[in-house]
Amino acid sequence: MMTNPKPWQQGSLIEVEITDLSDRADGVGRWEGRVVFVPDTVTGDRVLVRLVRVKPQYAYGQVQKLLTSSPHRIRPHCIVADKCGGCQWQHIDLAYQQQAKQQVILDALQRIGGFQDPPIAPILSSSSGLNYRNKVTYPLQRSAQGNVQAGYYRKGSHKLVNLNQCPVQDSRLDPFLAQIKQDIQEQGWGIYNEERGTGKLRHL
């Protein structure tokens, strides 16, 4: 597929090989010496990217097509992983997640903390990489039909992805989520409305 003749501008298409991950789990690639951050990618991916925010030396892009899939890429366990902003690592296999998170800590200690060779214990995780969150905070909203919704915001927005369960939280919390939403609905409690500045309940 042909890319634009002047590709370093918003809306242009470029091909990028992902060579690293940022501390936010965005894929990091380079194009003619400039850095490109691409969410939902992993080291080893080669992707066709549309630039959505462009600065002189770096840009953010959105994947338009996966050209080559990384061996670290897996199918997310969550059915709304491509929309939900609650976690950024679900498309990455657990072993590489641990490796990448370890590197994030090391980079922070060295570059920000000034430590030359800090001792870091291995990253610990659940055996499956799921059901490990024991504390969650869900924003609350009402749908256009007036139904109580709770979940996480869509990536880069305050539009809610309504959830009844989440594969990274402790599964014992799932029944409470649906029940509490039902209780709020039945009691008619006021959900905070960002546009109007009304209502009291903002988070669950």
Regions found by a protein language model. Name each.
Residues M1-L204:
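Accessory RNA-recognition modules of RNA-modification enzymes
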